[in-house]
Amino acid sequence: EDSMITRNVQRILSKDRDFWLNLKVTNRPDFIPELYCTKRVNNKAWTKEWLRLNGFPDRPVYQMYYQHGNKADMIKGKVDVFIDDSLSNVLKCQRSGLPALLMHTERTIDFPMFKVFSLCKDEIIDAYQFMRSYA
């Protein structure tokens, strides 16, 4: 079933500009991020446009089209800590030496990891320091 979903995203949604531009904002940082890093399969210009339309700070966008790739390969050395809502992405970054925190969502509720529940700078700093102390 997952491979069918992946094929449909690649074949259909990757070309649907309106789909990508109308995604709802689920989290908003209370700080200016160093960069954005995504594995979206859409045109990178659409991601930049979505960020602009939704009032996000203008920062570099690093986009990886290979879904099994490691985001750390693109951004290691550019950020102090990486936050993602994908367990796989967080684990790959951590194994590569890039500190990473898991964003708490319905999909990640059962994973007992170092998490953040918002993109609040103070919460991220606390979670990062806790992770560095105990990981």
Each PLM stretch: what is its role?
Residues 35, 60-63, 102:
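A structural preference for short, hydrophobic beta-strand core positions in alpha/beta folds
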Residues 82-119:
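Acidic, Mg2+-coordinating phosphoryl-transfer loop and its flanking beta/alpha structural elements
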Residues 31-32, 58-59, 78-79, 97, ...:
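Short, well-ordered alpha-helix to beta-strand connector turns
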Residues 40-81, 87-94:
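Substrate-recognition "cap/lid" segment bordering the active-site pocket of phosphatases
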Residues 2-36, 40-50:
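Short, acidic loop-to-helix structural element flanking the phosphoryl-transfer center
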Residues 61-66, 115-127:
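Short acidic-hydrophobic, aromatic-tinged amphipathic segments that line or gate anion-handling sites
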